[in-house]
Amino acid sequence: MMPLYLLGALAMSLCIAGLIEFQLHNRSLSSIPLRIHVNGTRGKSSVTRLVAAGLREGGLKTFAKTTGTAPRVIDPEGKDRIIHRLRLPSIGEQVRLLRYFASEKPDAVVIECMAVQPQYQWIAEHQMIKSHIGVITNVRPDHLEEMGPTEEDVAYSLCNTIPNEALLITAEDQKPDILKAVAKQNNSQVVCSDPTSVSQKEIDLFTYIEHRSNVAIAIDVCEKAGIDRQTALNGMHKVKPDVGALVVWDLMIKESTYKFVNGMAANDPVSTLGIWNSINDRYGLGKKTCIFFNSREDR
């Protein structure tokens, strides 16, 4: 049995190591002038890419990190770097990446929240990132096992990433009052993005189908960072879409053309219906529409 003094020495060593790690992390954060933390149910990866593209177009040296369908680091040139993990995903990954970003002396970092459990979402924002601008894209009935069981519970869980004495930008239209109340408690201002402010012409310039709400959020974030709307949009229209982005392919089969819509990244009923309506408005869905449904084992 280990003597008590050895246990005490070990505990003291761990405490000292933790304090040193904490100080080093705070030093890394202080080296990043603008930190943007993106959370929400749907569209986190797309908004992260759009914001980073708008900031780059405005001349800010920007790093971004997505954690969606395929995790990526996006460098200041807009190039994707695949994140190779040797173990299961952990929010500790964010600390290591922030340290790397800080060493590159960026003007801004845009980082997607990778935490699901409510307590880890709080840690991700209030201990790890301490953002200047927080984003909650929307609140939808997803991850109900961890954040539910109700949509209201999901809203409160996502509110764990609302920053203190900073700014929250959201396009949430179902539970906005919850977000505003928590932001007020945190002494943070709220900007509600308006999807109708984005024209169809601006949407049509994307190489894939982007949601108006995502673009509206990204424009508001960029404007708060000092980038004008048109400059930000110019950058967004050049963005490389996330792997899970809504893409439509034309398939030629026996001299007939079929449209295949990849909407499988939307894994909650509300978002799936939204995609259905969007595609119906754009292309029209007749009797010859076929649905491929991908059901996860844990759903």
Regions found by a protein language model. Name each.
Residues 1-39, 46-53:
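Short, basic phosphate-binding NTP loop
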Residues 26-32, 53-134, 138-155:
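ATP-dependent carboxylate-amine ligase catalytic core
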Residues 33, 104, 131-252:
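Acidic, Mg2+-coordinating active-site environments of NTP-dependent enzymes
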Residues 52-57, 223, 277, 281:
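Short, well-ordered alpha-helices that flank and scaffold nucleotide-derived cofactor binding pockets
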Residues 64-66, 135, 167-173, 289-294:
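Short internal beta-strands
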Residues 72-74, 119, 174-179, 298-299:
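Short, charged/polar "capping" segments at the starts of alpha-helices
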